[in-house]
Amino acid sequence: MSTSITSWLIVNARSGSNSDAALQALHAALAERDITIERQIDFPADPLPDPTQLDAAGVKRVIVFTGDGTLNAAITALAGWQGQVLVLPGGTMNLLSVRLHGEGIATEEILDRVAYGAVKPVRPLMACCEKGVALAGLLVGPGTAWVNVREAMREYDLVGVAQNAGAALSQTTTGTRVRLAEPTRGHADGYPLIEITPSDRGMQVDGYRPNGAGDVLQQGWALLRRRFREGPNERLGMFDRMVIESCADDPIQVLIDGEPETLGTSAEFTVAACEVDLLATDHGF
């Protein structure tokens, strides 16, 4: 199956698993399965490819070995393309890879499935807002300030970690909360953090409310590792459409597949199908 498909590879040296050793191991694993890479895109030094460029080069498959944020950008850039995208776990949490291939599935096993032809093109539902779409998930509210701690950790900036952790703790405890307005659900005085997880059954929505400093720190640690549900949370529902509003008419901070954006004081969230085929090797969600 693999040898006849012209493939390009997208990598990002800033992603969690994109060390030189990891990239060498990836190329070796691809070669062992006769999957030939015609060109490697080193994002962000190289621009992400678009459908016109890929079609002109005869590319039928793009393999993406990055974190969820770069994956989001790459898949968005390929909207409308008639080829296929293979997602590999090249980041820290690799939530989209989990969705497509299963929890804890290594790159080599995914490539084995591809080589065997044990794949299916799918167009999973995304969670959408005015600033973008999320295939892995959205976080909404002042608690998203913990992303600055994560970035400082990525840069090994210990001073930045300490400073941003203090700011994130303050934002989580005193920042303007957000609440589910349409439909009305949950606490009227809102949540420091709401998580939106897209699936083929719509958007799963969970809210987090701290009961003390220990809960705030627990949730911050969970957020840093992109494991929201390890912190204290409550299920608010499953929706195809909803509106989240600020409790004090302040702009709403969001993380879209881990990347920060700012919305207005009220924001609509809907679902839509991905606009390019992704290769799945597991039943997913």
Predicted segment positions?
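Short, well-ordered alpha-helix to beta-strand connector turns
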Residues: V59, Q82, Y191-L193, M238-D240, ...
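Flexible, charged surface loops at secondary-structure boundaries
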Residues: M1-T3, L54-G58, C129, T172, ...
